């Protein structure tokens, strides 16, 4: 009886050791199939088979030792690219198709990433998406910068890109904040309108006034020039001045930008 009990205990001990060895081996195999990448300071953990899905690409070359890649301080492969955009690259490798969040506006940057990682399929899908966006008519948005007491005074900026209108609006608000400790009641900001207390015309140009003490942001002419320069830098073109009777753009009441 005692011999049977001892024998069973030895069998259990052997089974436990055997299972531990198997678990350890499975753990090693699991780790060997995973890979941690440091892309521009962002860590991504994925399977090697995901990175090698498409042959003759940058990531496949790293996994199979065809391409030498530096390591970071923690021993992870370091790739000096856009860490935020890499998630879209990785999702393309996982899904085999391009899936982007609504309102994604970084097609050109993503196209550069696709080119760097040598993913022709991704590059083609990004290009196709960009071309479709260009063909899709975009609703024109506007920003009106007016006098609280006279809506006929001021400037209207029209554009077919809402994000650019927001950029100009943010710039005006930022400059205005730099002139004041806080916004007075006389200064009104809404979705499409920025209203100043007064537009005062002088020899130096129309001044955008905020407070009773005549603190002003800038001249209206300066604002027009800055809006035009911002638009050109962002790849827009000045379609026309909507009020051509004024002659010079500086004297126009409205500007229309298009991309």
Curated annotation (Swiss-Prot):
GO biological process terms held by the UniProt record: protein homooligomerization
Disulfide bonds: none
Domain BTB residue range list: 33-134
Gene3D superfamilies the record matches: Potassium Channel Kv1.1, Chain A
SMART domains: BTB
InterPro entries to which the protein is assigned, alphabetical: BTB/POZ_dom, KCTD4_C, SKP1/BTB/POZ_sf, T1-type_BTB
Protein name per UniProt: BTB/POZ domain-containing protein KCTD4
Organism: Mus musculus
